[in-house]
């Protein structure tokens, strides 16, 4: 796992995003998919909204996924394994990139076939505690012609990476292959989810510079 951590840190430092495969093994992905939460997820999860707290609204013309937040204190063992791995990654990022990440939040996500999420930024204007976005995909045997890619709109040259360097504006597509993890700057990288021809599953989260329970105090 240390090799994965090193690759993630190098990517974040150099270009503001990183992608690694096999962050979760196929066996670990299957164990998550077999949880009751992911069986008939569209029926059990809540329709995701846009905005935060009191300003939140449902708008399927912008966002079409369903989510269920993970309770870190009560999560099932397959999810706990993933969360512990995230905690180790946070510690590694803090040590190597001199960040001050203090907590994280994660929800289970399902996009029904044909649904999407239009271009957006993860960090809210009124709440800048989301520093890094992190997504782990749970889709076995995914084929590129099924679509569903995450499209990142990479920052213009005047927006620095964690090492203070910029890059040309361009897009980067990431297909939602099982076990693949993508991590990127929540404050800089706008992104969108393109429609897929089949259901698309992931664990979607954010690394924070504030404890979750203190964010709204």
Where are these regions (language model features)?
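Non-heme Fe(II)/2-oxoglutarate
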Residues: 3-92
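Conserved short histidine dyad/triad with adjacent acidic residue
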Residues: 108-125
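Catalytic core of Fe(II)/2-oxoglutarate
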Residues: 125, 130, 139-162, 167-217
